[in-house]
From Swiss-Prot:
Detected in brain, in hippocampus and dentate gyrus neurons. Detected at axon bundles and axon terminals, notably in the cerebellum and hippocampus. Detected in neuropil in hippocampus, lateral septum, basal ganglia and substantia nigra. Highly expressed in pyramidal cells of hippocampus CA2 and CA3. Detected at the heart and skeletal muscle sarcolemma (at protein level). Ubiquitously expressed. The highest expression is observed in testis, liver, kidney, brain, heart and lung. Expressed at lower levels in stomach and small intestine. This is Dysbindin. A motif (Nuclear export signal) lies at residues 243-256. It comes from the Eukaryota. Residues 286-301 have a biased composition (Low complexity). Residues 88-176 form a coiled coil. GO terms for biological process: actin cytoskeleton organization; anterograde axonal transport; anterograde synaptic vesicle transport; blood coagulation; cilium assembly; dendrite morphogenesis; kidney development; melanosome organization. The keyword Zinc does not apply. Keywords: Albinism, Cell membrane, Coiled coil, Cytoplasm, Cytoplasmic vesicle, Endoplasmic reticulum, Endosome, Hermansky-Pudlak syndrome, Membrane, Nucleus, Phosphoprotein, Postsynaptic cell membrane, Sensory transduction, Synapse, Ubl conjugation. PANTHER family: DYSBINDIN, DYSTROBREVIN BINDING PROTEIN 1 DYSBINDIN. The keyword Coiled coil applies. Belongs to the dysbindin family. Residues 274-285 have a biased composition (Polar residues).
Length: 352
């Protein structure tokens, strides 16, 4: 292809030069034909000069165009050379591609064999993975059994140690219980003896005073509430009651005053010896909360006294007050059965 292009360029150049030659020959023939043959004429130098200058200009333009064509031909030649080199490279690459395409069937066969080997390897890998998982399960079971055995041994040792500690603690508790039981029994016996002694002394004092004076003056011999006898001795609830109704209290005062005048007539010596500032004995009815919270007092103790200026109460009047107090106490116990039950329980525990 390039050779034909070069041949065409050379033929164009030859045609161009041959055309120039023919033009020059025709111009010469025209000059020769244009001369008159019959009558000679004088040469005109100015016309020749113009014609020569015209020819020179034409030849200069032709030479310039020929040079431009030569430069363009050289440029085209260089481009053609570069194009030929490029096409040579492309031809070599096409040849290589053709050779590689010819090798494709063999490559496909190799790929098929590789795929088959990969499938076989995949199956073998799955089998190995299953075997490894089974081995891991076996190892885990062995480790679990070993851990179970260790924990069982540890549990047995812990049970033995705790059993020994429990036996020692039981023995210690048994010794402490026996010791405390002995101490409790001893203290209970001491309390019972002291209580019996206190009752005997109180009863003896009451009997002596009653035999000497004919009435009981309990307020003078009242123990403090914080003493042992007032806190631990079971006291009759009748000695802690007080008549809270004002009308009943006034009627009782009138009755007691009338009874006191009779007693003054019967025993004037006793009235002179008694202190006029002494308070009369009153029966206080405790509320359920107070009866549950207050500790029992001694059997010879009584409640607080009312205002002074009242005569002392004789034994006959005490029986009247006790009867009225029993009625009120019976009604209170019916209304509050829990308090009486608590007092009975306290009495039973103290008797024990």
């Amino acid at each position: 292809m390039l050779e034909t292009l070069r041949e065409r360029l050379l033929s164009v150049q030859q045609d161009f030069t041959s055309g120039l030659k023919t033009l020059s020959d025709k111009s010469r023939e025209a000059k020769v034909k244009g001369k008159p043959r019959t009558a000679p004429r004088l040469p005109k130098y100015s016309a020749g000069l113009e014609l020569l200058s015209r020819y020179e200009d034409a030849w200069a333009a032709l030479h310039r165009r020929a040079k431009e064509c030569a430069d363009a031909g050289e440029l085209v030649d260089s481009e053609v050379v570069m194009l030929s080199a490029h096409w040579e490279k492309k031809r070599t690459s096409l040849n290589e591609l053709q050779g590689q395409l010819q090798q494709l069937p063999a490559l496909l066969q190799d790929l098929e064999s590789l795929m088959a080997s990969l499938a076989h390897l995949e199956t073998s890998f799955e089998e190995v993975e299953n075997h490894l998982l089974h081995l891991e399960d076996l190892c885990g079971q062995c480790e679990l059994e070993r851990h179970k055995q260790a924990q069982a041994q540890h549990l047995e040792s812990y049970k033995k140690s705790k059993r020994k500690e429990l036996e020692a603690f039981k023995a210690e508790l048994d010794t402490e219980h026996t010791q405390k039981a002995l101490e409790m029994e001893h203290t209970q016996q001491l309390k019972l003896k002291e209580r019996q002694k206190f009752f005997e002394e109180a009863f003896q004092q009451d009997m002596e005073q009653y035999l000497s004076t004919g009435y009981l003056q309990i307020a003078e011999r009242r123990e403090p509430m914080g003493s042992m006898s007032s806190m631990e001795v079971n006291v009759d609830v009748l000695e802690q009651m007080d008549l809270m109704d004002i009308s009943d209290q006034e009627a009782l005062d009138v009755f007691l005053n009338s009874g006191g005048e009779d007693n003054i007539v019967m025993s004037p010596g006793v009235e002179m010896e008694s202190n006029p500032n002494q308070n009369e004995m009153s029966l206080q009815i405790p509320s359920p909360s107070e009866s549950a919270s207050q500790p029992p007092a001694s059997p010879s103790a009584c409640t607080d006294l009312d205002t002074a200026d009242a005569p002392l109460i004789q034994s006959d009047e005490e029986e009247v007050q006790v009867d009225t107090a029993l009625v009120t106490l019976h009604t209170d116990r019916k209304s509050t059965p829990g308090v009486s039950d608590d007092s009975d329980q306290c009495d039973s525990t103290q008797d024990i």
